[in-house]
């Protein structure tokens, strides 16, 4: 059997903390956190004793918490100064999110998202003022991104551009998210769940292959997979972009080599499930989004997330993981195998005890 598991929240704790901010020349930490805080759907409130409380996506709350604690930037006050006029919400295809805010009589588009995707849409970088993004500077950003990812950090890039007026009609990514100025990289740690490494060892002991599937950078995914012993010597990692160029027949032949799938979209999950099934394996697949529903349906065991899962994902799944924890799937397999074994034993016992009566009945 094979368990294809999401990384964030299932293999990790989904409690992100900003631990590193990189910018060109190291002088634009505050600007990077400002963009990450404004281009953000987190709700910031305060308890009676004045302590801050955040509600929202853990990646986004990490930005708001870091900006508040380390730089004194309160999201609520910032939004009064620069209210959000409109937005292009995040989606897993673009891997970007953009918001537009008034600034100095013009408007500023603030963008955050996957660094490799974001960098490709930038034409300048914030250094000593705005500088053209040369190949040398782009390489600096790529190297900093790789260095953070190798430390198992989830990395997001921040960029902006100024426009004279908000575009009329429907906002498009081509119009808003191009010709940007790159500001910096923000690295966050999302520690693995304590119990997962033991659960992975139990998987291997039971003849089950754990596979990690994530939207994160390949180096980040591999670093965490190695820590959990999912990625072993001889294993390979592949990105969604590489999968796009790989025919399904080839994936079916090569699927056993891959322990980590990075920058993967929900459509890729379906292909991975079918490839494993072609190899004669029983496949369990986890998912939480609306787009995960087809893969959950196709998998032999679709596991929807009980905490972060959408109603659509839960409806398409065979089982709901109430605590979103990988170790719980392994315990469920253990319990299921125990029940199956007990049923077999009961049937053997009844047949062996009553064989005389059965023969008499048929004679």
List where the protein language model places each region.
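Conserved cytosolic headpiece of P-type ATPases
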Residues: 1-363
């Amino acid at each position: 059997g094979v368990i294809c598991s999401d990384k964030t929240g299932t293999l990790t704790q989904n409690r992100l903390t900003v631990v590193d901010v990189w910018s060109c020349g190291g002088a634009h930490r505050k600007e990077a956190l400002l963009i990450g805080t404004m281009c953000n759907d987190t709700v910031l409130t305060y308890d009676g004793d004045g302590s801050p409380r955040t509600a929202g996506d853990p990646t986004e709350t990490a930005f708001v918490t870091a900006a508040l604690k380390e730089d004194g930037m309160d999201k609520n006050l910032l939004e009064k100064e620069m209210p959000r006029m409109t937005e292009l919400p995040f989606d897993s295809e673009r891997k970007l999110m953009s918001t537009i805010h008034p600034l100095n009589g013009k408007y500023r588009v603030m963008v955050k998202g996957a660094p490799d995707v974001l960098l490709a849409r930038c034409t300048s970088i914030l250094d000593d003022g705005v500088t053209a993004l040369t190949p040398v500077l782009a390489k600096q950003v790529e190297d900093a991104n790789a260095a953070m990812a190798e430390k198992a950090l989830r990395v997001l890039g921040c960029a902006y551009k100024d426009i004279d007026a908000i575009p009329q009609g429907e906002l498009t990514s081509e119009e808003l998210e191009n010709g940007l100025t790159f500001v910096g990289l923000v690295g966050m740690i999302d520690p693995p769940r304590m119990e997962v490494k033991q659960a992975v060892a139990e998987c291997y002991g039971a003849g089950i292959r754990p596979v990690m599937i994530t939207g994160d950078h390949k180096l980040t995914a591999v670093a965490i997979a190695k820590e959990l012993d999912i990625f072993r010597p001889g294993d390979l990692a592949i990105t969604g972009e590489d999968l796009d160029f790989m025919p399904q027949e080839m994936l079916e032949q090569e699927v056993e080599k891959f322990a980590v799938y990075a920058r993967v979209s929900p459509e890729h999950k379906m292909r991975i499930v079918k490839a494993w099934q072609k190899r004669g394996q029983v496949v369990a697949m986890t998912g939480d989004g609306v787009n995960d529903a087809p893969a959950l349906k196709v998998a032999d065991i679709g596991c929807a997330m009980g905490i972060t899962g959408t109603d659509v994902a839960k409806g398409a799944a065979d089982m709901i993981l109430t605590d979103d924890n990988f170790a719980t799937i392994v315990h469920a397999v253990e319990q299921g195998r125990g029940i199956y074994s007990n049923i077999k034993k009961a049937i053997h016992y009844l047949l062996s005890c009553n064989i005389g009566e059965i023969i008499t009945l048929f004679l």
